Amino acid sequence: MASNRFDVQLTREAEKDLRRLQAHTGRVTRAILKLEDDPFLGHPLTGSLKGTRALEFSLPGSGVYRTVYVVNDATHVCLVLIVGPHENIYDRAERRVKALRRAGHIP
């Protein structure tokens, strides 16, 4: 029987984002790994980020954070593009998405 679980992968930049969160790495990782069972947990984004999704989660004492990711149904992969505080995340995500699309890594 085929598994319905998705493989959650992080871009190099998203890995750097995660390392910067130091004390919260475990909490953030647990939030992101929820995508293994439900990759559509986050909400779809529009405009220049169409085709990506955003997952919101809170970190005690640090506020609201987001991760922006792409779901590939064919390969059962969730590719995390960015992780960080809500402030300016979509502007930063746009730059990363543009670069990844230009390189042919995401549609």
Whereabouts are the PLM-identified features?
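Arg/Lys-rich, positively charged N-terminal/basic patches that mediate binding to nucleic acids
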Residues: M1-I32, H105-P107
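A general secondary-structure junction signal
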Residues: R12, L49, G84-P85
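A short, surface-exposed loop/turn module that caps and links secondary-structure elements
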Residues: L33-P60
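Enriched for short, Lys/Arg-rich terminal
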Residues: S3-N4, F57-P107
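Short beta->alpha junction loops/turns
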Residues: L21, D38, V83-H86
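A broad, low-specificity signal marking well-ordered, structured residues that form hydrophobic/aromatic
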Residues: V8, R53, C78
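Sparse recognition of residues in long alpha-helices and their boundaries
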Residues: R30, P44, G84-P85
